[in-house]
């Protein structure tokens, strides 16, 4: 199977820039893995890693809280991660 060129865009979130693979985000395979995350969390994590250009662990450590404070050694909170993923979805979703 031929490898497709991926469109990578920068998404701003709480004052920082993150590279996001727009092509991976639009993939049915990736979206299915995300939607089935409660049944297969590993597949959902792998899908997010594809969307985050292989840097999901780095991003978890870089996402600031609502107050702008950087996370500690455990990474961002689940609420901050959810806000980040929502911002990514809004930024890369097809516009009508």
For each feature predicted by the language model, list its residue ranges:
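Short, surface-exposed, charged amphipathic helix/loop patches that serve as local interaction elements
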Residues: 2-10, 14-16, 22-96
């Amino acid at each position: 199977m031929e490898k497709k060129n991926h469109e990578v865009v920068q998404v701003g979130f709480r004052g920082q820039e993150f590279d996001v693979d727009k092509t991976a985000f639009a993939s049915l395979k990736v979206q299915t893995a995300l939607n089935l995350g409660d049944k297969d969390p590993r597949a959902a994590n792998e899908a997010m890693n594809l969307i985050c250009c292989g840097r999901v662990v780095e991003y978890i450590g870089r996402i600031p809280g609502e107050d702008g404070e950087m996370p500690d050694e455990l990474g961002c909170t689940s609420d901050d991660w959810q806000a980040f993923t929502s911002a990514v979805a809004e930024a890369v979703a097809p516009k009508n």
